[in-house]
Structures are given as C-alpha cells and as structure tokens.
C-alpha cells in the first residue's frame, strides 16, 4: 500500500548533517490542522519551526519537509549521547487540539 501525501513546501529546513536513526513524534496543541500548517510553514525568523510530516485528525498526511532535509522540530536537544536530534531524526506532528 502506497501512502498518499499532501505536499507542502515549508521554508524551515536546512542540510541534514547525519543519517536518520530516530523518529520524534510531537503533538501540535493547536485547534486545527490549518493553524498547525500555518505555524509549521511560517518563514518569519522568530517562528521558524517545522516537521517532516503533520498527520491530521482525519488521517491525511501532510509532507512539509523532504526526508533528506533537516526539519526544525526538536530544538536544542540531547538524547542518549546524541546532540542535534534534528539532523538524525524524522519529525512527525500529530494534530491534537
């Protein structure tokens, strides 16, 4: 079964610096997927955040950043001796008010 993605182009990404070996799952805490998409694609310097995917409450999958690129979803982070979690992970946002 192939997954169908709704494609978007978030400006909030840069070059991945390491191989992918983690998934990071977040929840949005925003009322609607429309609000979440607007936030994740806002290119204003003070709002620069993104994820590779947003999964809507109805199951639709929005792709915002290509997997070969580094989305900005984990902030300044550290896990099990690894720094720069953004570079080694795929970020998935679950729409959840």
Region annotations inferred by a language model:
Residues 2-97:
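Active-site-adjacent loop/helix surface patches within enzyme catalytic domains
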